[in-house]
A protein has these predicted regions:
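Membrane-interface segments at or immediately adjacent to transmembrane helices
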Residues: 280-293
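Peri-membrane helix termini and adjoining interfacial loops of integral membrane proteins
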Residues: 122-133, 171-175, 205
Length: 293
């Protein structure tokens, strides 16, 4: 089975191909006209190969979880979280590549994807927590938080592209053939969608996390760093989407993009803070009372 390094290299090669497309547009590395269609095809094949090996790795993790535990424990470690987030981001990239083949979206999405895969190599792969109960809610909680953070990351890429595109249009600088990006309307609507759905996902992750603790421990530690930050993130994302919607109604597109960028920064800081502390573990008091569990 492939390891994370395999698809890390595959995605890095795809990023190099995206850079080659950009350099061709600038005229610094001109390509023959006959080679350009082939470059686009190779780019798509490379992304598909990366996603395929990525998917095989995820399946291997699932089978390993099923063979070593009485229940499925996918998205139960920080390694799983980073790998699944990167996989979802890779799926989004390929979908965008098929829908917007002329746009150089990969220059903004692929670096974030590589950071997530690199992060997965640096964080522990051991499951968070000690108990095997409430596994369904653990899975729902992990999946919801993963989807939420992935969408915030994708929204960040859309926000950066919007700001670049708006700056060029404002300065009336030529952009066709240099750095081809989607329209401002597309980037704004996509960014708003990412912010809205990420808020819903984080909120569902918060609720499922509370239920998981109630089922597993019979209580909820409301001062737990994970719960506090999840609640704070949900409140921020709801507030950010409301502010963004107000900006949309007033025609302030750049401010809507900045809300996506700011949301990504806040979520990234919160995730790093949660990573630095125990999360999802069975309380020590409960372990003392039930040494056999």
């Amino acid at each position: 089975m492939p390891n994370a390094t395999c698809f890390l290299v595959a995605y890095a090669i795809v990023l190099v191909l995206e850079l080659l497309r950009w350099l061709d547009g600038t005229g610094r590395v001109p390509l023959p006209s006959a080679a350009k269609p082939w470059l686009a095809r190779i780019l798509l094949v490379g992304a598909a190969v990366g996603l395929f090996t990525h998917s095989l790795y995820l399946l291997d993790r699932i089978f390993l979880s099923a063979s070593t535990s009485s229940s499925l424990r996918l998205v139960s470690s920080w390694h799983d979280w980073a790998i699944v987030s990167a996989w979802a981001l890779a799926c989004s990239y390929i979908w965008l590549l098929l829908k917007r083949r002329e746009s150089l979206i990969g220059l903004f999405v692929l670096p974030l994807l590589l950071v997530l895969v690199g992060l997965s190599l640096a964080v522990p792969s051991e499951p968070l927590g000690n108990g095997s109960s409430a596994t369904l809610w653990r899975l729902v909680h992990g999946a919801s938080m993963t989807i939420g953070t992935m969408l915030v990351t994708l929204g960040f890429a859309m926000g950066i592209m919007y700001l670049i595109q708006a700056y060029r249009l404002k300065r009336k600088r030529p952009h066709q053939g240099v750095l081809r990006l989607p329209s401002l309307e597309y980037l704004q609507s996509f960014g708003s969608f990412c912010l809205l759905v990420s808020a819903a996902s984080i909120g569902f992750g918060l609720v499922s996390g509370v239920i998981m603790n109630l089922v597993r421990d019979g209580q909820v530690n409301w001062t737990d760093r994970g719960i506090l930050f999840s609640g704070g993130l949900f409140a921020w994302l709801v507030f950010a989407f409301w502010i963004q919607w107000q900006f949309v109604k007033r025609g302030k597109g750049a401010q809507t993009a900045w809300m996506n960028v700011l949301s990504f920064v806040i979520v990234a800081v919160a995730v790093l803070l949660v990573m630095s502390a125990p999360h999802g573990e069975v309380p020590a008091k409960r372990l003392d009372e039930n040494p056999q569990s």
